[in-house]
């Protein structure tokens, strides 16, 4: 069976993701589609709107065959570390190809860019340092250095191009046999908050509408019915969807009661930002106003969000430095095709395949996952909090036997 990997967050799963799945299947002739998905906290430092279990159900209902979890230590990171963890997991599961969405839509541009980067890495790094010294944020310094290095370069001001470039580099750096492919993103950009297309909108815009109105019917045209069902069921069960404001009291407590020395141990805390965090948190009444007051050219909104997640989960620089590569494959869900594929390859897997998280106790990567889950589920009152914690440790992988969306 030919296995093709995709790297996803599904926050939530929408029609643009559906398009990506269909195009991936058509382009690659995949027999088995494997998604490596971020858990409860995401790459841009945000809590997922619903849990990884609800998002796994969305993915399986849409036709993904296997869903595995990208551990927290890779999921809540800048593009390079995020990509490194994700492609290593897909390789460990035997994926022959990786297909990602991008603004470019041209894999040749990514391959040429990666070749240029490897040939001129020292010059590129020097250009980045120069831009950082001028006060630019890392994403802008990266994009400007790339523009100076190659005038016909891939546009690295576009977020999905940045991720795609990181995937291709990670495949090359790790000397993996995975063949990268890309398809163009449809209509809405990653950060687009408008509804300019009749059926395609970004996850950012969908979350904004849900946060402001709480009305699922306002986004019904942009998501599959199975996504709507999962969102509705989650709110009925747990009384809410997740956003940063739910965690702001906990963050404020952590920052007020941590010393500057404590904060300097946390991953991402550099260049004296700990003083600014403690200064700005005192008068901040919402997460949004806190980040707006704290951000600088160097410390962007996204970088601060990731840092704040690490503060909540007490994820240290030491732990980050030790997290060199995934140590397990955690299975979140599968359908019959996925079950047959795993049966076929299970003796050849490069990492242990884990169905029940209890077997991972003591693994450093999973110990961090437990802390992330304890934070994520703290948005619930008791007894829901304890029930959600138990779900993390006791839930078996979801087996989906229903029909795909037509």
Curated annotation (Swiss-Prot):
Entry keyword annotation includes tRNA processing: yes
Swiss-Prot/TrEMBL keywords: ATP-binding, Cytoplasm, Ligase, Nucleotide-binding, RNA-binding, tRNA processing, tRNA-binding
Uppermost EC category: ligase
Subcellular location field: Cytoplasm
Gene Ontology BP terms: tRNA modification
InterPro entries (alphabetical): Rossmann-like_a/b/a_fold, tRNA(Met)_cyd_acetate_ligase
Catalytic activity, as annotated: cytidine(34) in elongator tRNA(Met) + acetate + ATP = N(4)-acetylcytidine(34) in elongator tRNA(Met) + AMP + diphosphate
GO CC annotations on file: cytoplasm
One Gene Ontology term of the molecular function aspect: ligase activity, forming carbon-nitrogen bonds
Keyword Oxidoreductase: no
Signal sequence extent: none
EC number assigned by the record: 6.3.4.-
Binding of ATP, residues: 7-20, 101, 160, 185
Cross-referenced NCBIfam families: PRK13670.1
Family: Belongs to the TmcAL family.
Function per UniProt: Catalyzes the formation of N(4)-acetylcytidine (ac(4)C) at the wobble position of elongator tRNA(Met), using acetate and ATP as substrates. First activates an acetate ion to form acetyladenylate (Ac-AMP) and then transfers the acetyl group to tRNA to form ac(4)C34.
Annotated protein name in UniProt: tRNA(Met) cytidine acetate ligase
Name of the coding gene: tmcAL
């Amino acid at each position: 069976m030919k296995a093709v990997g995709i790297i996803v967050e599904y926050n939530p799963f929408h029609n643009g993701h559906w398009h990506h799945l269909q195009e991936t299947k058509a382009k690659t002739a995949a027999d088995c589609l494997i998604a490596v998905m971020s858990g409860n906290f995401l790459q841009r430092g945000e809590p997922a709107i619903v849990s990884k279990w609800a998002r796994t159900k969305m993915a399986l209902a849409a036709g993904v065959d296997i869903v595995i979890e990208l551990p927290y230590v890779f999921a809540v990171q800048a593009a390079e570390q995020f990509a490194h963890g994700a492609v290593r997991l897909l390789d460990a599961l035997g994926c022959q190809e990786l297909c990602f969405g991008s603004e470019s839509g041209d894999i040749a541009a990514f391959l040429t860019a990666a070749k240029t980067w490897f040939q001129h890495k020292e010059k590129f790094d020097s250009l980045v340092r120069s831009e950082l010294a001028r006060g630019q944020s890392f994403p802008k310094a990266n994009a400007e250095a790339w523009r100076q290095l190659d005038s016909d370069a891939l546009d690295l001001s576009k977020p999905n191009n940045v991720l795609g470039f990181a995937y291709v580099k990670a495949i090359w750096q790790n000397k993996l046999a995975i063949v990268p492919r890309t398809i163009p993103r449809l209509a809405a950009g990653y950060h687009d908050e408008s509804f300019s297309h009749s059926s395609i909108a970004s996850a950012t815009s969908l979350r904004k509408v849900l946060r402001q109105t709480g009305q699922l019917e306002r986004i019904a045209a942009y998501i599959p019915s199975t996504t709507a069902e999962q969102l509705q069921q989650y709110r009925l069960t747990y009384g809410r969807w997740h956003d940063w404001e739910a965690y702001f009291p906990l963050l404020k407590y952590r920052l007020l009661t941590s010393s500057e020395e404590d904060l300097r141990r946390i991953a991402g805390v550099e260049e004296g930002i700990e003083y600014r965090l403690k200064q700005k948190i005192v008068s901040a009444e919402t997460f949004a106003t806190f980040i707006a007051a704290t951000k600088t050219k160097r410390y962007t909104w996204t970088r601060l969000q990731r840092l704040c997640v690490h503060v909540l989960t007490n994820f240290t620089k030491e732990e980050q430095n030790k997290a060199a590569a995934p140590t397990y494959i955690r299975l979140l869900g599968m359908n019959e095709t996925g079950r047959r594929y795993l049966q076929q390859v299970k003796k050849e897997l490069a990492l242990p395949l884990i169905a029940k998280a209890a077997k991972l106790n003591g693994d450093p990567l999973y110990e961090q996952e437990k802390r992330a889950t304890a934070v994520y589920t703290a948005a619930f009152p008791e007894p829901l909090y304890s029930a959600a914690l138990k779900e993390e440790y006791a839930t078996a992988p979801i087996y989906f036997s229903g029909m795909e969306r037509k």
